[in-house]
Design a protein with these regions (language model features):
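Short, contiguous strand/loop micro-motifs
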Residues: 9-12, 77-79
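A short glycine-rich, Lys/Arg-flanked "PGG" loop and its adjoining helix->strand segment in the class I
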Residues: 14-34
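SAM-dependent methyltransferase
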Residues: 32-94
Length: 133
């Protein structure tokens, strides 16, 4: 979640794309079913920035970085990566705005630590559990 693309000139706070994605997820759920959504944590990005927040836009919650991608022959090209990060409160409010009933948000490291049951600044991701009424 939060990987829908770079900054949009017509969406200065970077909400429209993510709101439309979560609205689509809501429509795909049958009533009574649950949504489990993983998103990157703004708190983690800020806490672990090593003093350099130049690549993190505080207004949009978006981190920009450039990486190299190699084709099958080994030729490398530069590629921009834009990652939107969220606070637990933002995820909760976005779920409510999409018509979901948020149940919990917790801090996790995908593939490593799904047992966490609280929020902290040391896990890279947030996990939202919500239900479609």
């Amino acid at each position: 979640f939060g990987l829908q693309g770079g900054p949009a000139a017509l969406d200065p706070v970077n909400l429209v794309g993510d709101q439309s994605v979560i609205a689509g997820m809501t429509r795909a759920l049958k009533p009574g079913c649950r949504l489990l959504l993983a998103a990157f944590s703004s708190y983690f990005q800020i806490t672990h920035a090593d003093g350099d927040l130049s690549e993190f836009d505080l207004m949009t919650g978006t981190r920009h970085e450039v990486t190299g991608i190699k084709d099958p022959t080994g030729y490398e090209i530069a590629a921009d990566l834009w990652t939107t990060c969220f606070t637990p409160r933002e995820l909760w409010l976005m779920a409510q705005a999409a018509g979901l009933e948020p149940l919990t948000v917790r801090s996790v490291h995908s593939g490593e630590d799904w047992a966490a049951d609280s929020l902290d600044v040391d896990h890279a991701e947030l996990l939202l559990l919500a239900r479609r009424p």
